[in-house]
Amino acid sequence: MFYSPLDQFELKPLLLITDNLTFSITNYTLYLIIVSLIIIFYSSIIRHNYLGSSRWGVSVIAIYDTILNLVNGQIGRKGGYYFPLIFTIFNFILIANLISMIPYSFAISAQLVAVVSFSLTLWIGNVVLGLYLHGWGFFALFVPSGTPLALVPVLVLIEALSYASRAISLGLRLGANILSGHLLMLILGSLIISLMSSSFLGFVSGIIPILAVVAITILEFGIAIIQAYVFSILLSGYIKDSVELH
């Protein structure tokens, strides 16, 4: 039972080992392991072609083709090098978001520190990739073509700040959407339960709001999928900038 809307996002130690060094396994760690195991199982099915012609198999193939087309469309002929990374990240976010929709589960993607750290890691990887491929020429990315010489210092500063903000915005967008959606569902659900348990009239008047909560829940499932896809689109675009410098 949650006594505060924010209780569902609290990190709770499940196993605490204290000696010279404190080591703990939290609910975040547990769900991280669960999502990782599902991805390993999922990847094994694809790799060994165990899908068949079932609806499940068709769905997996559709997801695979969708992300492959996305990567090839964004990055071009070199997209195949980066497809495994983007496909894995898409599935990780998607599975984590869908698991978080199970009542009383834990939303990995709503941990802002974790998702921002994740996006920061990817951003650093993009910078390293750009420097590896282009050397100092990578910084030409911050100078738009055809820029008058007098405006170069200003535009370089603006472009550099815009590029640096990706390190936070990529993860913050994901975390904020999942966090706000789960808070909204829990707050509305708690209010409806309080209303319906107050009296018979309250029980009757709470039926219509329940339908609204059901609609919001369906919307949250859609957001869970969309956010994974948006994250993949943005990451593909950022990799394209590092590869092609535009």
Swiss-Prot record:
Stated family: Belongs to the ATPase A chain family.
Protein name (record): ATP synthase subunit a
Cellular localisation: Mitochondrion inner membrane
Tagged with keyword Glycoprotein: no
Assembly mode: F-type ATPases have 2 components, CF(1) - the catalytic core - and CF(0) - the membrane proton channel. CF(1) has five subunits: alpha(3), beta(3), gamma(1), delta(1), epsilon(1). CF(0) has three main subunits: a, b and c.
GO CC entries: mitochondrial inner membrane; proton-transporting ATP synthase complex
Protein function: Mitochondrial membrane ATP synthase (F(1)F(0) ATP synthase or Complex V) produces ATP from ADP in the presence of a proton gradient across the membrane which is generated by electron transport complexes of the respiratory chain. F-type ATPases consist of two structural domains, F(1) - containing the extramembraneous catalytic core and F(0) - containing the membrane proton channel, linked together by a central stalk and a peripheral stalk. During catalysis, ATP synthesis in the catalytic domain of F(1) is coupled via a rotary mechanism of the central stalk subunits to proton translocation.
Protein keywords: ATP synthesis, CF(0), Hydrogen ion transport, Ion transport, Membrane, Mitochondrion, Mitochondrion inner membrane, Transmembrane, Transmembrane helix, Transport
Database matches in Pfam families: ATP-synt_A
PANTHER family with a match to the protein in the record: ATP SYNTHASE SUBUNIT A
Lipid bilayer topology: Multi-pass membrane protein
Propiece residues: 1-3
InterPro entries noted in UniProt: ATP_synth_F0_asu (IPR000568), ATP_synth_F0_asu_AS (IPR023011), ATP_synth_F0_asu_bact/mt (IPR045083), F0_ATP_A_sf (IPR035908)
Keyword Protein transport listed: no
Main localisation: mitochondrion
Organism in which the protein naturally occurs: Candida parapsilosis
A single GO molecular function term of this UniProt record: proton-transporting ATP synthase activity, rotational mechanism
Transmembrane segments: 21-41, 56-76, 82-102, 113-133, 138-158, 184-204, 206-226
